[in-house]
Amino acid sequence: MHIRPSEITPEPVWRGRRRLLGAALGSFAGVGLPVSAAGTEVDHPNSLEQISRYNNYYEFSTNKEVIWKLAEEFKPSPWTLTVEGEVDKPRSWAIEDLLKRFAQEDRIYRLRCVEGWSMVIPWRGFPLASLLKECMPNSRAKFVEFVSVSRPQEMIGQRMNTLPWPYTEGLRIDEAMHPLTLLATGLFGAALPSQNGAPLRLAVPWKYGFKSPKAIVRIRLVESAPMTSWMRAAGSEYGFYANVNPEVPHPRWSQRREVRIGELAKRATLPFNGYAEQVASLYGGMDLARNF
């Protein structure tokens, strides 16, 4: 199902709602309520056209500017998400049941690609922790593995060996349970477009974009760190943690500066993509250059 622009809240309407919400939240600043869902200074989101027409989605192509067209025939419904592994209550949900069970929140997050570009995206979704708690992880659940859909008949990039398919990613359990870690179901107040990972993707704003898999069908809680698709393809370049770190360059891209899509000038990249206050304590005592 291709989400037409007319099916997404028009940007002027969406931005008007955000201004009203911001004014309302501002009146509560004295009692400590956050003025943004991310807990950081408010960024202005990129436009819908920028967000939906410049995408890294190797399941379709390595050309970012054609993904939206190639994804038009992708069918995100019906859809089932399964949670299994080291949990006391494994289960599966239809996407419609997930949307009913978990209250949807609007959050504006920064997205930083390891290639040196960035965006600001207004996601809709719910905390991954809410889903995992319902399945009751046991004491052996140390990591969380995410598996994306495999449909080479629709996702023509999967017909090539660009990456090991299906796309697989992982987080530590404490990263997965962090309040910022979002299962995104929407964009600009409406359902996700296929090219942005419909119907369900991860959004982990303090990590590089490849740590946020799209079109997730399976979540598995495991004892050991899962081997991700990028680690299998180029483990010396793509580590398990992938925290945004301006002090640790990628072999092909410096990470000190970034270009926000729609802007000409580069800007300094912030540690943990600007979310250090919320997440740096997760990595206390770790060598972040070694654990990249």
Identify the residue ranges that each predicted region occupies:
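N-terminal secretory signal peptides
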Residues: 1-16, 27-29
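Structured, non-membrane catalytic/scaffold regions adjacent to prosthetic-group chemistry
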Residues: 39-292
